[in-house]
Regions:
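N-terminal glycine-rich "phosphate-gripper" loop used for MgATP/nucleotide binding
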Residues: 93-97
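Short, well-ordered alpha-helical microsegments
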Residues: 99-102
């Protein structure tokens, strides 16, 4: 899922300071699951904004807080918010950057304030309360060849053909040895599975055209004009 983190309150207050009417919108997708941007966090942010304005002696503030199913879906975002957004000049979004941009596109006359920083695509370890980056959406997945461990993301240099000379005792030289070397993990995994032929396979440099930004997917393919 998309991993995000709430921005420092000072930053949110600064972006919202000129508005007397604010709509705070959470997202029931990724940011809600990781307890950063759902209904509950929207209500908490509402209380904090009200408190901040009171402390500054500025009493006139109307805030509504709610959450919608997904902010990254054009139709869901526009149908869920169409009636409520009209009463507010600004919306504070607790969704990832995709949600914020979807709202900005659907409601171009409103100021959309991002309240979270989008970090990465990652895995949640609920027990440890940690998130780990696992995929960089490279557009050409090679996990089948690497024992389900992504070298593009988990190797600090995104190497494709085994470890660099910097690994020491299974640890990566980047990051002061705190992370495992992805290629040692891959080697061990493939060895366990008796698949070391995949480890020695030579992989050509990647074709980065598949991950040029901005990418698109789906829709009807354009019909090519036939030459007369
Ligand atoms: S190879 Fe890695 S970055 Fe590419 S799609 Fe697979 S998991 Fe994601
Ligand atoms: S030590 Fe391992 S994980 Fe780190 S950059 Fe080299 S190959 Fe990649």
């Amino acid at each position: 899922m998309i991993i995000a983190q709430q921005k420092p309150l000072k930053e949110i207050f600064e972006m919202a300071k000129n508005f007397k009417r604010l709509l705070i919108v959470g997202c029931d997708g990724c940011t809600s699951i990781i307890q950063v941007g759902g209904e509950k966090q929207a209500q908490v942010l509402k209380s904090l904004l009200e408190m901040e304005r009171r402390l500054k002696g500025k009493k006139k503030l109307t805030i509504e807080a709610s959450s919608i199913l997904r902010q990254c879906d054009r139709d869901i975002a526009s149908t869920s918010l169409r009636s409520s957004v009209k009463d507010y000049p600004a919306v504070i979004s607790l969704a990832c950057g995709v949600g914020v941009q979807t709202l900005a596109e659907q409601f171009p006359d409103k100021i959309i304030i991002p309240a979270v920083d989008t970090k990465f695509i990652g895995m949640h370890d609920t027990e440890a309360g940690k998130f780990y980056e696992m995929c960089r959406a490279c557009g050409d997945c090679i996990l089948f060849e690497t024992g389900g461990i992504c070298p593009i993301t988990r190797c600090a240099k995104s190497l494709l053909n085994g470890p660099c000379g910097g690994q020491a005792k299974g640890k990566c030289e980047v990051g002061e040895g705190k992370n495992d070397c992805a290629w040692i993990l891959i080697y061990n995994r493939l060895k366990e599975r008796n698949k070391l032929d995949l480890f020695t396979k030579f992989r050509l440099p990647r074709d980065y055209r598949v991950s040029e930004h901005p990418r698109e997917l789906g829709g009807e393919p354009e019909e090519k004009e036939e030459k007369a």
